[in-house]
């Protein structure tokens, strides 16, 4: 698959107004999204990866084929993405089974059971993004992409077995809109208050997270996914749709092609 994109910087003071404008344009309410994004780096040369390890036995054949193609294609940084909720931030880690059993015997009239973050049941998917194509005539960012589901819980064991080491993680917070075949994501990157050598089993409070852009700005990303990137007519139509959105939003933001090297995912 291929992904075609345009990007725009959005100052903090313009965020609320742009949300309203996008809601009107797409005739839908924003779908709020929070994601954990784990960054892994390949340390093993392609052709040496065996994806049939550990919990990956639970994956379906089609998912395994996608994983094989992604992980054997070259040495890249890749992301493992998992959806989370606002309630997960600052929540205690999920108690073990015997603690749950003990709690179940307490007075039913007591307050509502607290929310726990259950890392062992955290869903994940692997997202591969190639470096954008060079010297494209179209004024959009175009890159090869793929994604596949991963086992829930601790993904470091299968990722290490596949030749990938954990590097760091961050969070993304934003709102999704759908406009015809375009996915519009108005978002910002959030850093954790401290670094970690492995994925966190417990998340800090959301107000402890710090924006990557200290000015409070956001990024507007408009993306179209094309199944057959070799079909030039389909790619041309997708580009035209992005140009149409750019024209509709030109009074508010400047959607443009990203710098190719800023999206370079190759592991050096």
UniProtKB/Swiss-Prot annotation:
Alphabetical UniProt keywords: Activator, Nucleus, Transcription, Transcription regulation
Keyword hit for Transcription: yes
GO cellular component, one term: core mediator complex
Chief place where the protein resides: nucleus
UniProt cross-references to InterPro entries, sorted A to Z: Mediator_Med18
Domain of life of the source: Eukaryota
Record GO terms (molecular function): transcription coregulator activity
Record bears the keyword Transcription: yes
Pfam families with a match to the protein in the record: Med18 (PF09637)
Record field: compositional bias (Basic and acidic residues): 99-112
One example of a Gene Ontology biological process annotation: positive regulation of transcription initiation by RNA polymerase II
Region feature (Disordered): 91-112
Subcellular location: Nucleus
Homology family: Belongs to the Mediator complex subunit 18 family.
PANTHER family named in the record: MEDIATOR OF RNA POLYMERASE II TRANSCRIPTION SUBUNIT 18 (PTHR13321:SF2), MEDIATOR OF RNA POLYMERASE II TRANSCRIPTION, SUBUNIT 18 (PTHR13321)
Function statement: Component of the Mediator complex, a coactivator involved in the regulated transcription of nearly all RNA polymerase II-dependent genes. Mediator functions as a bridge to convey information from gene-specific regulatory proteins to the basal RNA polymerase II transcription machinery. Mediator is recruited to promoters by direct interactions with regulatory proteins and serves as a scaffold for the assembly of a functional preinitiation complex with RNA polymerase II and the general transcription factors.
Subunit structure of this chain's protein: Component of the Mediator complex.
Protein name as catalogued: Mediator of RNA polymerase II transcription subunit 18
